[in-house]
Amino acid sequence: MEQDKIRIKLKSYDYKLLDQSVKQIVETVKRTGSSVKGPIPLPTSRRRWVVLRSPHKFDQSREHFEIREFKRMLDIVKITPQTIESLMEISLPAGVDIEVKMRG
């Protein structure tokens, strides 16, 4: 069941929470004897909205809102069965989205 590579993509709106989760994954993988390439920071996606402050008049009074989505990527090589087992047992915070792909 030995694969060549596992690619993990993490997304979050809070970069501190994201970096903490990446650090936890890297420590777990290194403890099991596998090696990690990364974390690789991916481009941050930004969404912006401009909203009028008043109900119908005063066009010049506007409010700006922005939300940023931070992303990181990890590649795990030299995978062992203990690595896969320990990755499945990791509990990550609620604000972090994780996507795992195995490549053979």
UniProtKB/Swiss-Prot annotation:
PROSITE patterns: RIBOSOMAL_S10. SUPFAM superfamilies: Ribosomal protein S10 (SSF54999). Gene3D superfamilies: Ribosomal protein S10 domain. The keyword Cell cycle does not apply. Disulfide bonds: none annotated. Keywords: Ribonucleoprotein, Ribosomal protein. It holds the Pfam family Ribosomal_S10. Transmembrane segments: none annotated. InterPro entries: Ribosomal_uS10, Ribosomal_uS10_CS, Ribosomal_uS10_dom, Ribosomal_uS10_dom_sf. GO terms for molecular function: structural constituent of ribosome; tRNA binding. Involved in the binding of tRNA to the ribosomes. Belongs to the universal ribosomal protein uS10 family. NCBIfam families: PRK00596.1, rpsJ_bact. This is Small ribosomal subunit protein uS10.
